[in-house]
């Protein structure tokens, strides 16, 4: 075996629940990475870089582990919308996104701390938002509090009601951990799935 344990570099309950679908034992660890986009960085590049940085940050503390990192950025016409952090910012993001098609770039990285091998894939999802009224946006933000969610919409919960449609290769990508891509990477590391 080329690793001693599997570690998810995230404290997200949604990512943890998704990874549990693989029925593999794993731990979680906070990555403590600055998620600020670099100047002139394209949205998929930001997501890829942060997914790898998160996995590497945790791999330093778990030198025999296989570490999974993930990151998601929402982009509207090339502009990145990260985690809003405040109610006002969440409302502002959703006001900008109403009626628009937003691309959610979700990257997943696997770092084998023992061998140094790094794998990363990016899975985009196109999301068409409804024409939302200000009242709908305020009600949603008040009920859901999507302050820690790229683009301010949690599709795995009440946020699904904000959408007209979505399209992508992996339905789990929009929730924050693309399991189809991840299963490919874990099999490449020797894990037996299923």
Swiss-Prot record:
InterPro entries membership: ITPase-like_fam, Maf-like
Catalytic residue list: 71
Protein name: 7-methyl-GTP pyrophosphatase
Catalyzed reactions per annotation: N(7)-methyl-GTP + H2O = N(7)-methyl-GMP + diphosphate + H(+)
UniProt cross-references to NCBIfam families, sorted A to Z: maf
Cofactor (UniProt): a divalent metal cation
Record carries keyword ATP-binding: no
One cellular component term from this protein's GO annotations in UniProt: cytoplasm
UniProt source species: Aromatoleum aromaticum (strain DSM 19018 / LMG 30748 / EbN1)
A Pfam family that the UniProt record links to this protein: Maf
Domain of life: Bacteria
Swiss-Prot/TrEMBL GO biological process terms: nucleotide metabolic process
Enzyme Commission no: 3.6.1.-
Localization, UniProt: Cytoplasm
UniProt GO MF annotations: nucleoside triphosphate diphosphatase activity
Disulfide bonds: none
CDD domains referenced in this protein's UniProt entry, alphabetically: Maf
UniProt keywords, alphabetically: Cytoplasm, Hydrolase, Nucleotide metabolism
EC top class named in words: hydrolase
Recorded family membership: Belongs to the Maf family. YceF subfamily.
Residues with site note (Important for substrate specificity): 14, 72, 156
Biological role: Nucleoside triphosphate pyrophosphatase that hydrolyzes 7-methyl-GTP (m(7)GTP). May have a dual role in cell division arrest and in preventing the incorporation of modified nucleotides into cellular nucleic acids.
């Amino acid at each position: 075996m080329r690793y001693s344990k599997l570690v998810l570099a995230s404290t997200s309950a949604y990512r943890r629940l998704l990874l549990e679908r693989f029925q593999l034992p794993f731990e979680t660890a906070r990555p403590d990475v600055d998620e600020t986009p670099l100047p002139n960085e394209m949205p998929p590049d930001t997501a890829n870089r942060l997914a790898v940085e998160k996995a590497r940050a945790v791999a330093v503390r778990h030198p025999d582990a296989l570490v999974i990192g993930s990151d998601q950025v929402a982009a509207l016409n090339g502009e990145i919308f990260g985690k809003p952090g405040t109610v006002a910012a969440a409302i502002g993001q959703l006001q900008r996104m109403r009626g628009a098609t937003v691309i959610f770039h979700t990257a997943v990285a696997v770092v084998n701390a023992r061998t140094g091998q790094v794998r990363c894939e990016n899975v985009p999802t196109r999301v068409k938002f409804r024409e939302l009224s200000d009242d709908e946006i305020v009600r949603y933000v008040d009920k859901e509090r999507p302050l820690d969610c790229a683009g301010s919409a949690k599709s795995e919960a009440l946020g699904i009601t904000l959408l007209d449609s979505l399209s992508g290769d992996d339905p789990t990508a929009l929730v924050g951990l693309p399991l189809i891509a991840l299963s490919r990477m874990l099999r490449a590391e020797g894990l037996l799935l299923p």
